[in-house]
């Protein structure tokens, strides 16, 4: 057994851990050990580096923990996929590369919780900007010199993108030129974490590439954190496994848990921090009975509403093996072409009811009919909308199964447990059909493939959701930030009741944000990094942002009405 000592030990080199490792080692006198259970982010592996290949990492276990849920009681008892990234970059190494920050009111809502007053949107915006380099340059809402490369959608990529945005506007919803700017609500182009050379912009590329040469940062891959060590109520180190070898590292200052919304509560529970009754079931000595560890688990569900495409403009030919070498060669040599995009270049956010305070439904538009993980491709030209609700009231949990760090925990999201879930999904399907009926899509829209035109009643729509809805891969909130009885960490990520221990990742969100989670997770880590370093928080940015204030969710007067038979 080997033993080393560092100022900070970070468990997990993902979207948050790499940010902390990079920012903390900007101070040359600070030493950091970064532990990652997966391997390197191999730059010659097209599966993780080519944006268009985003489905491939989810199909194996080299880069994916490939968790499964317990049977979900409201989803036909399906065991549902729960992919999480494994390797330098974490889930930013295998995600869909959609750069969505969330709605301003997400953060303003967080700030209404006791003790979280400094998490308003205007407090968070400087850290979004700090992390970002946007290809069209900085402005009041965007950064121009950060580690994360953000690419904007360019005109003429595929006519279906513009047609689907136009259809949303024709249906009476707003148009927005920037889903991360003044107004998230509406339809428009989608920003993506892709470099100017057409490569995935993971946090390993953006952050670790600048930090890994520093002598005060040690990165250890294939290192699975087993337990956090404690001296009384103070975290003092970590034991971890590299193959059959066990090692121990001691932390002079803090242990920083950045393992994600599944593995962070798992590591805490295995270390004796969590619901006391759960720990006693496995004979784990209780360091602190903290009931919220693993509770409050949230995610986004989504469906694929799919249509036949009457014109040969979809990505269907690119799915054929004989066309892929040319696509791959252009991407490899020039960083251009179909391989250089994740093809989520347009989308949007809407409110389905006028009394919704901010958008409750998200859209990703895709010019092909296929599942996110590459399965169930429709053998024809097609297109689809990924659509799902944003802030489900349903809550789940992550619970340890055993003391073995190699065993996956018991995961139950408890999807669709509340009546509001069902109402929002029915509303979403009907709103999507209304959008797809608009004149902008007349030349492209063929028959509805899924759910199918005959699926109309509430009962039929509910059956489709139970059988076909899937995760959007956004687990979060399982070690929530706050000060109520179920809160795990304070506003700086410090675990309540303990010293020298923080959690910094998507698990500390009190409520899931409106959209994809990679950008918010990076922001959270940037913000808390300043707290750890004892630096003054970046000044609030005083910019306006859209608030509906009871405005109509959809302008019916401007909508183009189309018969339902179209």
Curated annotation (Swiss-Prot):
Catalytically driven reaction(s): choline + A = betaine aldehyde + AH2; betaine aldehyde + NAD(+) + H2O = glycine betaine + NADH + 2 H(+)
One BP term from GO: glycine betaine biosynthetic process from choline
A GO CC annotation given for this chain: membrane
The protein's Enzyme Commission number: 1.1.99.1, 1.2.1.8
UniProt-annotated catalytic positions: 474 (proton acceptor)
Residues reported in the UniProt entry to bind FAD: 7-36
Name recorded for this polypeptide: Oxygen-dependent choline dehydrogenase
Species of the source: Burkholderia lata (strain ATCC 17760 / DSM 23089 / LMG 22485 / NCIMB 9086 / R18194 / 383)
Organism phylogeny: Bacteria, Pseudomonadati, Pseudomonadota, Betaproteobacteria, Burkholderiales
Gene name for this UniProt entry: betA
């Amino acid at each position: 057994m080997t033993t080393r000592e560092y100022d900070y030990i970070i468990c997990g080199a993902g979207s948050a851990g790499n940010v902390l490792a990079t920012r903390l080692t900007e101070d040359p006198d600070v030493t950091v050990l970064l532990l990652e259970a997966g391997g390197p982010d191999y730059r010659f592996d097209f599966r993780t580096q080519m944006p268009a290949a985003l489905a491939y990492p989810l199909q194996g276990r080299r880069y994916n923990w490939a968790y499964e849920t317990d049977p979900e009681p409201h989803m036909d008892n399906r065991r549902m996929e729960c992919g999480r990234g494994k390797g330098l970059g974490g889930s930013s190494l295998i995600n869909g590369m959609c750069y969505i920050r969330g709605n301003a009111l997400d953060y303003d809502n967080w700030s209404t919780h006791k003790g979280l007053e400094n998490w308003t949107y205007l407090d968070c915006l400087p850290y979004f900007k700090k992390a970002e380099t946007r290809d069209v340059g900085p402005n009041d809402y965007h950064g121009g010199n950060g580690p994360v490369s953000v690419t904007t959608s360019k005109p003429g990529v595929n006519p279906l993108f513009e047609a689907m945005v136009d259809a949303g506007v024709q249906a009476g919803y707003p148009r927005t030129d920037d889903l991360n700017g003044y107004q998230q609500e509406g339809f428009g182009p989608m920003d993506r974490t892709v470099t100017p050379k057409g490569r995935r912009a993971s946090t390993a590329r953006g952050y670790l590439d600048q930090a890994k040469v520093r002598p005060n940062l040690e990165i250890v891959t294939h290192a699975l954190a087993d337990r956090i060590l404690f001296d009384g109520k103070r975290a003092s180190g970590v034991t971890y496994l590299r193959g059959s070898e066990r090692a121990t590292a001691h932390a002079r200052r803090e242990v920083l848990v950045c393992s994600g919304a599944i593995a962070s509560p798992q590591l805490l529970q295995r270390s004796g921090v969590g619901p006391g009754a759960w720990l006693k079931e496995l004979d784990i000595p209780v360091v602190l009975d903290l009931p919220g560890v693993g509770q409050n688990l949230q995610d986004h569900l989504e469906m694929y509403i799919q249509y036949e495409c009457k014109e040969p403009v979809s990505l269907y030919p690119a799915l054929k093996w004989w066309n892929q070498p040319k696509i791959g060669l252009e991407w490899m040599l020039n960083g251009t072409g179909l391989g250089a995009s994740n093809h989520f270049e347009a989308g949007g956010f809407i409110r389905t009811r006028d009394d919704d305070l901010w958008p409750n439904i998200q859209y990703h538009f895709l010019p092909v009919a296929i599942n996110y993980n590459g399965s169930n491709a429709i053998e024809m030209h097609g297109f689809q909308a990924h659509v799902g609700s944003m802030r489900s009231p349903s809550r789940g949990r992550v619970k340890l199964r055993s003391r073995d760090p190699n065993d996956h925990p018991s995961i139950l999201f408890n999807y669709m447990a509340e009546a509001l879930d069902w109402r929002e999904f029915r509303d979403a399907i009907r709103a999507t059909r209304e959008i797809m009926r608009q004149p902008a899509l007349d030349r492209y829209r063929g028959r509805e493939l899924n759910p199918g035109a005959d699926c109309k009643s509430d009962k039929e729509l509910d059956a489709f959701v139970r059988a076909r809805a899937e995760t959007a891969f956004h687990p979060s909130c399982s070690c929530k930030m706050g000060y109520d009885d179920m809160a795990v960490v304070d506003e700086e990520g410090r675990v309540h009741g303990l010293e020298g221990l923080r959690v910094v990742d998507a698990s500390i969100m009190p409520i899931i944000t409106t959209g994809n989670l990679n950008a918010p997770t990076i922001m959270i880590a940037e913000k808390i990094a300043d707290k750890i370093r004892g630096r003054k928080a970046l000044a609030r940015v005083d910019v306006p942002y859209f608030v509906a204030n009871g405005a109509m969710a959809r302008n019916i007067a401007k909508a183009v009405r189309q018969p339902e038979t179209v």
